[in-house]
Each structure stands twice: as structure tokens, then as C-alpha cells.
Amino acid sequence: MAVITVRWVVQAFADAPEIALIYGEPWEDMRQRSSAAINPAIPDETGFRIPKTDARLRYMHPQYGFDTPLARFFTISFKDERVSSIRMSPQIEPLLLDDAMKIVQDLQDQWRRRGWELTSPKTDPAIADTPEWRTRLRDINKGGTTFWQADDTYQIMLILHRFKDDRHPDEERYLISLSIGNIWVPREKD
């Protein structure tokens, strides 16, 4: 089973179109580095663009970098021809809880290893693969939200919640949402 999982992960990342960026960089630098096509920014405007195909995010920061799986919902905003925010759902379709939890745990593990810290560990702790978290996530009215930040520069909001998927009406499906931008939630005080 482990060999199959490793092979799947390697294949999933090997040839996947990607958007490779650093928050705040010039839009054209991101476009030239990325293998997924995305339209140019509009000079002197604020707006967003969507990759022309499913793509994964490769966050290229030398200290805080990380990679996501392929995403169907993926928007990159610009202001003054610079990357100004990222919003995405790092999945192609709503997932079963086990599959969604694997992605969330992988992302959080990457962030920990690269120096990201929880913004509010008491009120918005990391999402854990525990019976308590699974019970909470199964409640359609709850879900889980956690915030991570890189020094005092960038912040990530990660949300995992149950999602009604009409294609799979008899299954519990889950949606992961990820936003990256300037810090908008202050650090929790001790």
C-alpha cells in the first residue's frame, strides 16, 4: 500500500502544470516561471486571473516554500502588476474525509518544516487527524479553520469543511480552501 501511495504522489507531481510564485513578486516573473498558462495582469489595475488548466501551486519562497496538489479552483490576484493574493482549493473535486485529511496533514507538515507557525494555536489550532477533529468536521455547521504565518510577512488561512456534492449524494465529501496574503489575523497573545 505504501508503494502505491508513493508512486501516486510522485506521478501526481511529476508532470502537473504548476503556478510557481512568490507573494508580492512581479506578475510577469510568475508567468515566465510557471508551466500552467495564465493571462497577463492589467497595468495600473487590481484584479485576478485563473490558470487556463488545473494546476498546482509551487510557492517558491526560499525559506517558506511549499507545494500543493492540483487545484481546479485557483485564483491569483494582482495589484499594480504584482501578485497580491492567492485563493485556491488544492483538489480537483470534493474528497472523502480520509483523502482530504491526507492533503491537509501534508500541507501543515510542509509548513512546520519550512518555519511557518500557527497564528492562534489556542483558538485556531492545527487540524489534526484525531477522532475529535473527525467528529467536528463531520458536523456540517462546524468544520475547521486554522491560520499559519511566516514571520510577520505572510499568512495562510486553511479551511476544511463538509461539502454537499450532488455527484456523490450518499457520501460525505469535503472541501479544502487555502488563502495566502498579507497578515490579516493578529497573533494570539499568550
Would you name each region that the model predicts?
Residues A2-E81, S89-P90:
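N-terminal leader/targeting segments
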Residues V10, A20, Q105-Q108, M157:
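Generic detector of well-ordered alpha-helical segments enriched in charged/polar residues
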Residues L70-G143, W184, D190:
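Long, charged/polar, surface-exposed segments that mediate recognition or autoinhibition
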Residues A41-D44, R49-K79, P131-D190:
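Long, continuous compositionally biased terminal/linker segments
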